[in-house]
Structure formats: structure tokens, C-alpha cells
């Protein structure tokens, strides 16, 4: 995949990254999604501290939480908001000092409406990146008309050529949208049952439940998968390789948008000041283009996104769209447990 070093300019940046190539900063451990060690987003951090942070990676939120709750020590973690209630209940995180977050005043207050994200105790989660889960498809082999509805996942024509995210939130957002539900905030038992029934009809068509963006990109590039419920990043990987991939974010039922962000780990092993150096580096306007280019995700800092031309945002599928959007907000822990358990049963054929 094309990376972002060409965006970096200036002798200071070049020297900083030359030093970083030899050693990671031991005073900051970042626990992040695979693929998120993006050099262009770390320029301000490296210029100030001389080296990139120490990175450790995870594949999904469940894996990340299990690791930190079992004793793994990190300074900052990059979960999506659905995982935040578990971090709080386990006493693993502490509120952010928002006065040290340079972009904080620019962030949309609507992102902080959940009591799990912000309450009287402070801000527990800093929203950072957002993207979509929508229909990725092979432009050569799948007619555009076939992907105008989520029912494509039930189409026998694509049996065994479909892949769906092995992520409970993504899967249930898909199933709820397909059955006419656009939020899980007040979902009923009947609506859960209807969504589960829809998923059970889809499951026999699924060749793989993908868990890694590069894995999905490889399966689509090989022709093994023709239609997928995908994040932006597999599409970005395929487009960087000039593969003919489409990404329909506006089927008739809608698509889903998710955002992820940062939690400040209590008793992290590194230096707290460097946690904020890293956060500010990620929010920096100079970081937006490298992240969009590398993995196709947008930055919730409007000043950062303003640095990216509209046509480039459209090409990366991070421009605003006019469609029904199922926003993946934090859900009640008891609902999450129920949906995770039901999803495991569905994947197992029950």
C-alpha cells in the first residue's frame, strides 16, 4: 500500500524519522489497531520527542480489552466507544485533562452526548477518527444495481463470495438497518429477534467473517470475495493497488458510521505529558492527509479535514453523504453481551 512519507517535508522531519527508525520511545506505549502506526500522523510527536512511540497492536476491541484487563500495561488505547463502558467498569481509565488537548474546543459537542463518554466525572473518551461500514464490491464482476440494497448479502448469486466483518457492532448495525431499525439505543426484543433472523438467512452465503482489513483486501483482490460489508481501509488498500473496487455507502436501507478514539489508561507505565503530545500529534491538521491516504479514515477535527480537498475526500469515501446512517454509539452493557452471544451462535450455525 502507498504510504505517506512523500507528504513529509523539511529536513527536521527527515532527521526525526531517521532517528525514530532506530529506536521507539520507551516512555510512551500506544495500544492501537493494526495498521495505525502512520508516520505522517506522528510528525509533531517525533519532532518534539525524537522518536516514535512504542506501538503494540490489536485486531479488535474485544482482544484489546481482554489484554489490558489481564494486566498488559499501556499509556493510551484506541478503542471504539462501544468498548468504553467496559473500560470504565473495570476501573482501567481516567478522565482526560481537556485543557491539554489542543483541538478539543473544535470537536463537535454531539460526539460527547453519551454518558459513557462524558459525565460529571469528566471526559473519559476522546473521539478521533470516523469512517463507514458499507458495501464494498468488485466493479468488474458485480453490477452496480446489485448493491443498491443490503439484500445483496442474501442473494444466492453471491453465495460463497461474500465476506462480512467479524465485529459484533458492524454485524448488528447491518442487520438492524436491513430490518428497518436505525438505532440500537432503545431497541426492543422483537427488533433484535428480527435482526437475528435476517442474519441467519445471510450466514450460509458468507465465505468468511473477516477480522483484518488487509485480509479482506487480499480476498477481494484474488477474486475469492465479490461483495463485502467493509470498512474504509480495505477499500483504501485496494484503490492504492489500482484494483477496481466500489464502495456503496448509500444503499436504500442506509449504511453505518462508526468513530473511535482514545482512552487514558490509569497508572500507565510511561510519561503522562507524552500521552498528550501523541494525542495532539494525531489531531494535528498535518496528520489528516496521511491517515486518509494510508487507511481511508477521517479526523473529527474540522481544521484537520479542511486541509484535504473535497475531491480527495470523495475519492477516499470520507465526504459527507445524504443517506440513512446508523451511528454506532455506546450501547448498554447488557445489550452488548446479548448481541455478542447471539452473533457467536449465528456464526456457529445455530
Q: Positions of the model-derived regions?
A:
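Early extracytoplasmic/lumenal segment of secretory-pathway proteins
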Residues: 24-87
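Periplasmic-binding protein-like
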Residues: 41, 158-169, 192-202, 241-266, 281-305
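Extracytoplasmic ligand-binding site segments that recognize negatively charged/polar headgroups
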Residues: 78-84, 88-207, 211-217
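A ligand-binding cleft/hinge motif common to bilobed small-molecule-binding domains
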Residues: 83-88, 221, 227-244
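Ligand-binding "clamshell"
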Residues: 88-95, 119-123, 238-250, 313
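A bilobed periplasmic-binding-protein/Venus flytrap-type ligand-binding module shared by bacterial periplasmic
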Residues: 136-141, 176-180, 259-271, 279, ...
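C-terminal capping/gating helix-and-loop segments adjacent to ligand/active sites or protein-protein/ligand interfaces
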Residues: 289-350
Amino acid at each position: 500500500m502507498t504510504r505517506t512519507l512523500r507528504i513529509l517535508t523539511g529536513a527536521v522531519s527527515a532527521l526525526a524519522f531517521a532517528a525514530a527508525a532506530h529506536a521507539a520511545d520507551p516512555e510512551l506505549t500506544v495500544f492501537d489497531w493494526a495498521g495505525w502506526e502512520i508516520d505522517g500522523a506522528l510528525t509533531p510527536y517525533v519532532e518534539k520527542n525524537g522518536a516514535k512511540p512504542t506501538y503494540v497492536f490489536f485486531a479488535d476491541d474485544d482482544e484489546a480489552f481482554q489484554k489490558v484487563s489481564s494486566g498488559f500495561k499501556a499509556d493510551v488505547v484506541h478503542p471504539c466507544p462501544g468498548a468504553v463502558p467496559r473500560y470504565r467498569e473495570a476501573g482501567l481509565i481516567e478522565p482526560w485533562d481537556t485543557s491539554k488537548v489542543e483541538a478539543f474546543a473544535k470537536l463537535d459537542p454531539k460526539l460527547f452526548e453519551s454518558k459513557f463518554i462524558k459525565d460529571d466525572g469528566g471526559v473519559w473518551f476522546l473521539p478521533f477518527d470516523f469512517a463507514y461500514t458499507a458495501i464494498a464490491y468488485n466493479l468488474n464482476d458485480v453490477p452496480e444495481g446489485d448493491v443498491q440494497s443490503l439484500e445483496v448479502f442474501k442473494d444466492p448469486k453471491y453465495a460463497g463470495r461474500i465476506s462480512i466483518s467479524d465485529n459484533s457492532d458492524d454485524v448488528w448495525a447491518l442487520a438492524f438497518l436491513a430490518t428497518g431499525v436505525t438505532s440500537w439505543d432503545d431497541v426492543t426484543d422483537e427488533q433484535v429477534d428480527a435482526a437475528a433472523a435476517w442474519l441467519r438467512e445471510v450466514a450460509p452465503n458468507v465465505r468468511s467473517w473477516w477480522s483484518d482489513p488487509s485480509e479482506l483486501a487480499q480476498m477481494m483482490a484474488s477474486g475469492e470475495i465479490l461483495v463485502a460489508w467493509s470498512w474504509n481501509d480495505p477499500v483504501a488498500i485496494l484503490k492504492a493497488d489500482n484494483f477496481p473496487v466500489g464502495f456503496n455507502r448509500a444503499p436504500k436501507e442506509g449504511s453505518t458510521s462508526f468513530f473511535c478514539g482514545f482512552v487514558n489508561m490509569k497508572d500507565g507505565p510511561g510519561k503522562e505529558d507524552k500521552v498528550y503530545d501523541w494525542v495532539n500529534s494525531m489531531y494535528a491538521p498535518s496528520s489528516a492527509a496521511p491517515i486518509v491516504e494510508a487507511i481511508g479514515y477521517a479526523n473529527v477535527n474540522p481544521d484537520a479535514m479542511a486541509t484535504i480537498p473535497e475531491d480527495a475526500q470523495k475519492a477516499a469515501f470520507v465526504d459527507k453523504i445524504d443517506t440513512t446512517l446508523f451511528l454506532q454509539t455506546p450501547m448498554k452493557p447488557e445489550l452488548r453481551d446479548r448481541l455478542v452471544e447471539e452473533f457467536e451462535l449465528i456464526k456457529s450455525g445455530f
